[in-house]
Amino acid sequence: GVGERNGLHPINVMVISLLLGRSLGMKSEELHDLRVAALIHDIGKLKLPPHLRQPTPSMIPMERTRYETHVAESVALAKRMGFADAVLTAVARHHEMCDGSGFPQRLKGPDLGRMSQVLALVNQYDRMCNPARGVTALTPHEALSVIFAQLKARFDSVVLGAFIRMMGVYPPGSIVQLVNDRYAIVASVNSSRPLRPK
C-alpha cells in the first residue's frame, strides 16, 4: 500500500544514489553525506496532512504549493538534527532540475551541485517506478526511456549518462522476451555487454 511505498522510497533512493555516486567517483565523505540526504530528503512530509504527502495530477494549485513546503520542512528538521551543510543543501535541492523547472528555488544546472543532481534524478526515477496512488507505475526500463526521451533536459548530462550506463539498457526488474520466445526477469546488468543482461 501507500504506507509501504512511502517507507521504501528513501531506502530505494539511498541504494541507487550510492551506486550512482560511486560510479561518478564520489569520495567516501560525499557518499556518506549522500546516504544521509537520500534517507531524510522527504522527512518534512511528516508535517503535511496525509492526503498531501504525494503529488497527484488532480492537486489544485493551493495543495501543490503546500506539498512543495515539504522541502523547507525537511531542511529545517535536518538542521535541528545537526546534519552537515552538504546534507542540508542536497535535501534543499532534491526537487531542483538542471533546466530550472524544479522547485522550490527554480535553480539551474551549475547551481545544483553533483550530490543534488544525483538525488533529484534517482528521486524522479523511483517515483516513476513506485508512484503515488492513482498513477500507473512504469517498469524500470520504461522509466529510463521516459527520462532519456522526454525529461533529459532536467538532468545533468554526465549524471544521466552514468545512470543509464549503471542501470543498463535492461535494468534489473525489467521483463524481457528471449530469442526462444520465453520471458525472463533481468536480475543484473552486464556492464561489458549491455544488450545481454543476466
Predicted regions and their residues:
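Histidine- and acidic-residue-rich, metal-dependent catalytic cores
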Residues: 1-198
